[in-house]
């Protein structure tokens, strides 16, 4: 009953403003990346540009970005003006680890469960691959197209999902249904991007949420773990290039945020004012954790293509 009441009264934070695509440029002199919108000046580095898509539910479209954690939107925030933090930070983290420029796209659908993502994401992903710039050498746009007029393939697709499916458990939907739908979604994604693309299924660190009072918080966390176990199960159904990423601990996320912001870890809030979605710091820490975990798989996938 308490869960049903929260579902009925919950008000979500708004989506991030700004672009849904951009470019994280790797700076060899500082070993860091800077994020820009696509279409800026290019560099003839001879280095392959990577392409990453962060797709899925409200976390992919940046719900909570620009919120200071107390329900107030900051006047000038990078996430508020530059698009979803999760996709941008994932591209930055990937670029720093892979020493490469990373083109990013965010394909988020607020409120979507996995069944909804099968209807909405696949057409959007197919359209996005028409404009993905992956295998060029950072020359002009025309040189990045292949002989069919298409851009080259996407290197990584991160699928954010689970929380909206978890809400369906209130009305009796089982975790096995989520697993079946997710398996089909992954297959459909791979039909679009190819088996050489790394598909990433991250677990959700729901422990950071402040929305749920005890004992509901303990129940919600355990249920979330059960849904995350289905992601791990799905990843094992595929021979290669489907990766489950376990969730980071709260301490690890705060340490990452402290390193990024220069603030004391214990003082950092990771959740926006709606009590469940990450704020900018939370998204950044989570995204960099995902990036770190998927680098070995991505390196193997790229090596296999040579």
PLM region descriptions:
Residues 209-246:
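Substrate-gating cap/lid alpha-helix
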Residues 1-54, 60-67, 297-298, 302-306:
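N-terminal secretory targeting modules
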Residues 164, 205-208:
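Short "lid" loop at the C-terminus of a central beta-strand within the Rossmann-like core
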Residues 97-98, 185-200, 230-245:
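A structural motif corresponding to the C-terminal end of an alpha-helix
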Residues 160, 202-203:
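Alpha/beta-hydrolase-fold catalytic nucleophile elbow
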Residues 254-268:
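Short, flexible, mixed-charge acidic loops at enzyme active sites
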Residues 49-53, 59-180:
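Conserved SGNH/GDSL esterase-like catalytic core that processes O-acyl groups on lipids
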Residues 267-306:
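Histidine-centered active-site loop/cap adjacent to the catalytic His
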């Amino acid at each position: 009953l308490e869960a049903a009441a929260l579902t009925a009264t919950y008000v979500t934070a708004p989506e991030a403003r700004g672009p849904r695509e951009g470019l994280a440029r790797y700076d060899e002199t500082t070993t860091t990346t800077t994020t820009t919108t696509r279409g800026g000046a290019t560099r003839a580095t001879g280095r392959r540009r990577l392409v990453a898509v962060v797709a899925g539910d409200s976390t992919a479209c940046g719900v909570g970005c620009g919120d200071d954690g107390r329900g107030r939107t900051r006047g000038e925030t990078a996430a508020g003006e530059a698009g979803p933090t999760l996709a941008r930070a994932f591209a930055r983290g990937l670029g720093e680890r892979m020493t490469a420029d990373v083109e990013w796209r965010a394909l988020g659908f607020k409120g979507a469960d996995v069944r909804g993502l099968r209807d909405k994401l696949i057409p959007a992903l197919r359209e996005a691959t028409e404009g993905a710039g992956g295998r060029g050498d950072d020359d002009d746009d025309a040189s990045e197209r292949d002989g069919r007029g298409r851009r080259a393939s996407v290197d990584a697709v991160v699928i954010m999902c689970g929380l909206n499916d978890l809400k369906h458990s209130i009305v009796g939907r089982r975790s096995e249904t989520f697993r079946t739908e997710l398996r089909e979604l992954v297959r459909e994604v791979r039909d679009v991007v190819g088996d050489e693309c790394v598909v990433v299924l991250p677990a959700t660190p729901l422990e950071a949420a402040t929305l749920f009072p005890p004992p509901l918080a303990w129940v919600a966390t355990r249920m979330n773990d059960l849904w995350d176990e289905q992601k791990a199960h799905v990843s094992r159904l595929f021979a290669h290039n489907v990766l489950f990423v376990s969730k980071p601990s709260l301490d690890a996320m705060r340490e990452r945020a402290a390193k990024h912001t220069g603030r004391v870890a214990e003082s950092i809030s990771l959740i926006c004012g709606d009590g469940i979605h990450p704020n900018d710091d939370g998204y950044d820490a989570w995204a960099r954790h995902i990036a770190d975990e998927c680098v070995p798989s991505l390196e193997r996938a790229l090596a296999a293509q040579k």
